[in-house]
C-alpha cells in the first residue's frame, strides 16, 4: 500500500544528496510516486519523463520469469484442461487489450508492444498445444 509514495519519500533524500536541482528531484520523485496508482502526496506537473517510471516498471514486469511465476501462483498445473483453456483464452484477450494502454513515450510504447507480443505468442502456443490435447494433467 502506498508503494509509489513511500518509494518517492525514500528516494528524495538520496536524490537531494546528489546535488540535483530541486526541479529534477521533484520530477523524479513525482514519477516514482505516481508509478503505481497515479497518485502523489505532493503537487507537480505530469510530464512524459514522470510517466517513464511507471512505463519502465510495467515493461520490466512482463518477462519470461513472470509467466512462470503467474502460472505457479494460479496453480495452473492443478487445473483441469477446460479451466486451463479458459484461463489461457482470457489471458490472451487481456493482453491484447493492454496494447491500448497509453505510455509516456513512443519508445516505451514500442517496448511495451514487444513485451505483450512475446506474452501473447507464448499463450497462443500454449493454447494450440492444449487444443490438440485430450487431457493435460
Model-based region annotation:
Residues 16-33:
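Acidic/histidine metal-binding catalytic segments
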Residues 20, 39-137:
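Divalent metal-dependent phosphate-bond-processing catalytic cores, especially two-metal-ion Mg2+/Mn2+ enzymes
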Residues 2-17:
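An active-site-proximal "capping" alpha-helix that borders the catalytic cofactor pocket
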Residues 28-36, 53-56:
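Short alpha-helical scaffolding segments that buttress acidic/His motifs in well-ordered protein cores
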Residues 14, 36-37:
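Short acidic, glycine/Ser/Thr-rich loop/turn "cap" segments at secondary-structure junctions
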Amino acid at each position: 500500500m502506498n508503494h509509489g509514495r513511500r518509494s518517492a519519500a525514500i528516494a528524495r533524500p538520496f536524490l537531494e544528496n546528489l546535488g540535483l536541482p530541486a526541479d529534477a528531484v521533484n520530477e523524479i520523485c513525482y514519477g516514482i510516486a505516481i508509478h503505481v496508482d497515479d497518485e502523489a502526496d505532493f503537487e507537480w506537473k505530469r510530464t512524459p519523463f514522470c510517466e517513464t517510471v511507471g512505463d519502465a516498471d510495467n515493461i520490466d514486469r512482463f518477462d519470461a520469469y513472470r509467466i512462470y511465476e503467474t502460472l505457479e501462483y494460479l496453480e495452473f498445473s492443478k487445473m483441469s484442461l477446460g479451466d486451463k483453456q479458459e484461463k489461457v483464452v482470457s489471458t490472451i484477450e487481456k493482453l491484447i487489450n493492454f496494447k491500448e494502454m497509453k505510455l509516456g513515450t513512443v519508445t516505451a510504447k514500442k517496448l511495451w508492444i514487444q513485451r505483450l507480443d512475446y506474452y501473447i505468442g507464448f499463450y497462443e502456443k500454449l493454447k494450440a498445444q492444449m487444443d490438440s490435447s485430450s487431457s493435460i494433467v
